[in-house]
């Protein structure tokens, strides 16, 4: 006997993960490999370079050539003409050498180069040349004197003809910016004549007149000399003396690296 049976089937809903995987489209392109292979063209180029012939060095004598080349120079029949500008330059150099020998220089060491000696001379003589230089055909410098009284007169007595005649030039007072010092400073500027005989001696000394009392600084009796460059006597750079306390003083000779007034005649006054 036939029976009719009715049955219900239920399908579960797909999981969320399954739905996501279904949505992802599968790519047909293959992934790029991480290992790179060498290009075929590069390999072929390397092989071609290896097959090339290596360079070789050959000498000239192996090919029948000379190793040296000799050139013979003969004297010119005509004298070589020097361009005018070069000959003029040579003449100027010769003239500069002559002028260098003829120009005047100081023939003494700057008194203040040895400060202790300068101080002792000022203490003993009440006057001392401090520094001096030649500038533009003029003699300029400074003098230190003791402040013995208010009225003072300082002069430079100079001769241009070996003391056959002489001239006195007044020095100008230099105001002390600090004040209250027991020493005064005077400056001088003496113009040199245009023509001076080659054998004439140029010498000068410093005179200090204070209320009728006369004091002289004559460079210890030698006077301060000005000579031509060619007649200058070189000085021994090593000079040592001992002051009253027994200490050596010579920063110019023993310690030349210390700052002194050595070579001051080429630099200029500091005031």
Swiss-Prot record:
* UniProt motif (PP1-binding motif) ranges: 56-59
Entry keyword annotation includes Secreted: no
Q: What does UniProt give as GO cellular component?
A: protein phosphatase type 1 complex
Keyword Repeat assigned: no
Q: Which UniProt keywords apply?
A: Carbohydrate metabolism, Glycogen metabolism
Superkingdom classification of source: Eukaryota
An example of a Pfam family matching this protein is CBM_21
Q: Which GO terms describe its biological process?
A: glycogen metabolic process; regulation of glycogen biosynthetic process
Q: Which GO terms describe its molecular function?
A: glycogen binding; protein phosphatase 1 binding
InterPro entries, A to Z = CBM21_dom, CBM21_dom_sf, Pase-1_reg-su_3B/C/D_met, PP1_regulatory_subunit_3
Q: Which residues form the CBM21 domain?
A: 119-227
User: What PROSITE patterns does this protein map onto?
Assistant: CBM21 (PS51159)
Quaternary structure and partners: Interacts with glycogen, PPP1CC catalytic subunit of PP1 and PYGL. Associates with glycogen particles. Forms complexes with debranching enzyme, glycogen phosphorylase, glycogen synthase and phosphorylase kinase which is necessary for its regulation of PP1 activity.
User: Briefly, what is this protein's role?
Assistant: Acts as a glycogen-targeting subunit for phosphatase PP1. Facilitates interaction of the PP1 with enzymes of the glycogen metabolism and regulates its activity. Suppresses the rate at which PP1 dephosphorylates (inactivates) glycogen phosphorylase and enhances the rate at which it activates glycogen synthase and therefore limits glycogen breakdown.
Quote the entry's note on domains.
The N-terminal region is required for binding to PP1, the central region is required for binding to glycogen and the C-terminal region is required for binding to PYGL.
Q: What is this protein called?
A: Protein phosphatase 1 regulatory subunit 3B-B
- To which species is this protein native? Xenopus laevis (African clawed frog)
